[in-house]
């Protein structure tokens, strides 16, 4: 039959131009789209042949084949799927917005749709061929049609398309791309195979290419025998009982490119209003560029086993260490598949998998403390970001936190907040903590002295994230969380009546000298008072309850962030009334020595806190002046 010419439907020429030049930024996608369509056609035949076995035409070895011809400058993708009639060819390939598979899906009702493994909601995927080809030829025959009733479709995307009736022995569709001159590098076995592995490795149907061997000179020799080039089964769609630990670990290494085994995995199938499968992994070790929050991270998104995109933020940033896949047909995709539309379905999936991960981490922490400790050592700091970033899950995340304390014995972060609460002293209703640059600086901080003497455990927070985290985490299990370097510390309930009376007497005795010290240091401190924190050291500095700690001020300065008015607050100087240096100051009559000692007590307290000393040389001279 002679060929018939058609023009594309309204505005299709413009849309084709958009697809070719703007819609897809990555040329590689063309192969993903064609393989996806072939898989779609095979899945449709697989479904329809259940009720009409004759459609298989005694051929149930479903396969997708990719061939290339360097001389002809062509790439051909073929399948033995359902195929198309001439009418379907004109409708589906002549109109951007229509998809035969989408119409097919809409015609299904009830539970049958659950058995149908289709992915055809994209409408324009076929036209991505024109990114790399200046002409496309389609040969197709509908399953069940006579061999002489096949259809040939040809277009250059510029002048409409032609259709003619041809003879085709085998059912299914064959798409031949006539490759553009500037895309001829695609005519390579290894490149095409790598694209299959990257985008379509988990297609349920075998994807085949002719075997390639090399002669003694290294020249490629293409054999007539086909081999399957997609390697990975969609294990996330299988029952957990059907997957071995070895298979789980092999798949993890494939998707993560990690040499080590995963620490744990979470395999989950969700059914109901929202249906999806997920297979999530937590690595053993963090990658070298882990702290780059701008780096792509997250899960590989599949729709019915077809890879859509990688590193899509289906996870909150504080779970960016999680690897794995999400596979769902409920996700809406825009016309290019490149950008997920932000809607309620996506939000629900993100919320659900976040909850699942936190729940599984909680189980791990209770069942296998050694393995959880390994997780915490690798990813604890980034998990802390969630306390501030994810208000709805703040309590769950708080329960997963681990810290060193004054009772834990070393810098290893092993103590949970629940552990701390379980061993609080009788009458204690506050969780005490201190933030510092390092474990040694924290555990030796003078402000711990009274707590150590009274046997009150204090959490030692030494990660840079801790200051920001604690601005949000103000209580746990109904217990207020209190920084011991801020505001007043009320330990009166743990004091004897004699000590309380003694402190009140000292406060009266020092009332005059405290005012004099404050006058000397008036430009440098907010206040001067006697300390309930100190037992051995002469002085320390604190800020008020709502002030920015000296540790935080230091970190902000190091980060190059200046202070708004009122943010960089003056410290409060606290003195130990029983220390001999403070007693000497109290009794000092020489105004110069009095001023020097006042300055020295402030500077050494600032130094211990790691605060910035504006004039280090002046500090050294002052110390040297009084060394005897």
Swiss-Prot record:
GO molecular function, one term: unfolded protein binding
Subcellular location as annotated: Cytoplasm
Chain intervals for the UniProt region annotation (A): 1-337
Region C, residue ranges: 555-628
CDD domains: HATPase_Hsp90-like
GO cellular component: cytoplasm
This protein's UniProt keywords: ATP-binding, Chaperone, Cytoplasm, Nucleotide-binding, Stress response
The keyword Protein biosynthesis is annotated on this UniProt entry: no
Coiled coil: none
Chain segments carrying region B: 338-554
InterPro entries on file: HATPase_C_sf (IPR036890), Heat_shock_protein_90_CS (IPR019805), HSP90_C (IPR037196), Hsp90_fam (IPR001404), Hsp90_N (IPR020575), Ribosomal_Su5_D2-typ_SF (IPR020568)
Subunit field text: Homodimer.
Function: Molecular chaperone. Has ATPase activity.
Membership in a protein family: Belongs to the heat shock protein 90 family.
PANTHER family: HEAT SHOCK PROTEIN 90 FAMILY MEMBER
Protein name (record): Chaperone protein HtpG
């Amino acid at each position: 039959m002679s060929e018939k010419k058609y023009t594309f439907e309204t505005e299709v020429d413009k849309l084709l131009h958009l697809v070719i030049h703007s819609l897809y930024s990555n040329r590689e996608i063309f192969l993903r789209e064609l393989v996806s369509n072939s898989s779609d056609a095979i899945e449709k035949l697989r479904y329809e042949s259940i009720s009409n076995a004759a459609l298989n035409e005694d051929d149930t070895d479903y396969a997708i084949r990719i061939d290339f011809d360097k001389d002809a400058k062509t790439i051909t993708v073929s399948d033995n799927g359902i195929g198309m009639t001439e009418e379907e060819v004109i409708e589906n390939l002549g109109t951007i917005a229509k998809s035969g598979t989408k119409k097919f899906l809409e015609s299904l009702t009830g539970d049958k749709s659950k058995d149908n493994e289709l992915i055809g909601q994209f409408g324009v995927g076929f036209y991505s061929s024109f990114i790399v080809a200046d002409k496309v030829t389609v040969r197709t025959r509908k399953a069940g049609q006579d061999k002489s009733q096949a259809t040939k479709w040809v277009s250059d995307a510029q002048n409409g398309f032609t259709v003619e009736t041809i003879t085709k022995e085998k059912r299914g569709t064959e798409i031949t791309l006539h490759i553009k001159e500037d895309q001829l590098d695609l005519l390579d076995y290894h490149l095409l195979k790598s694209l299959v592995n990257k985008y379509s490795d988990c297609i349920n149907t075998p994807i085949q290419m002719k075997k390639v061997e090399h002669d003694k000179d290294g020249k490629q020799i293409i054999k007539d025998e086909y081999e399957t080039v997609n390697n990975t089964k969609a294990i996330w769609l299988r029952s957990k009982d059907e997957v071995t630990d070895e298979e789980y670990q092999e798949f993890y290494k494939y998707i993560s490119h990690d040499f080590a085994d995963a620490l744990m995995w979470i395999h989950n199938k969700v059914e109901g209003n929202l249906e999806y499968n997920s297979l999530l992994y937590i690595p053993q070790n963090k990658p070298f560029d882990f702290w780059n929050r701008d780096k792509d991270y997250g899960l590989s998104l599949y729709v019915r086993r077809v890879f859509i995109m990688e590193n899509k933020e289906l996870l909150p940033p504080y779970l960016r260490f999680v690897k794995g896949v999400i596979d769902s047909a409920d996700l809406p995709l825009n016309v290019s598949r490149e950008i997920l539309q932000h809607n309620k379905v996506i939000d629900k999936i993100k919320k659900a998998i976040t909850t699942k991960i936190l729940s599984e981490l909680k189980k791990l922490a209770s069942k296998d403390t050694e393995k959880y400790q390994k997780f915490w050592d690798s990813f604890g700091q980034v998990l802390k970001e969630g306390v501030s970033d994810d208000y709805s899950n703040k309590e769950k995340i708080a329960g997963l936190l681990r810290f060193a304390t004054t009772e834990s014995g070393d810098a290893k972060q092993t103590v949970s907040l629940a552990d701390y609460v379980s061993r609080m002293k009788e009458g204690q209703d506050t969780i005490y903590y201190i933030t510092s640059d390092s474990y040694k600086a924290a555990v030796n901080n003078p402000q711990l002295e009274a707590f150590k003497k009274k046997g009150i455990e204090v959490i030692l927070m030494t990660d840079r994230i801790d200051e920001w985290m604690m601005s949000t985490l103000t209580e746990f299990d109904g217990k207020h969380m209190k920084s011991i370097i801020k505001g007043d510390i009320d330990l009166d309930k743990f004091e004897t009546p004699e000590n309380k009376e003694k402190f009140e007497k000292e406060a009266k005795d020092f009332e005059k000298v405290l005012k004099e010290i404050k006058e000397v240091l008036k430009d440098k401190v907010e206040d001067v008072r006697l300390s309930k924190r100190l037992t051995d050291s002469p002085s320390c500095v604190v800020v008020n309850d709502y002030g920015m700690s000296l540790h935080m001020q230091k970190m902000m300065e190091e980060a190059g962030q200046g202070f708004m008015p009122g943010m960089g607050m003056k410290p409060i100087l606290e003195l130990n009334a029983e220390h001999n240096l403070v007693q000497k100051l109290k009794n000092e009559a020489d105004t110069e020595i009095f001023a020097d000692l006042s300055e020295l007590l402030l500077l050494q307290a600032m130094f211990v806190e790691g605060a910035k000393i504006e004039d280090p040389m002046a500090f050294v001279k002052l110390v040297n002046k009084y060394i005897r």
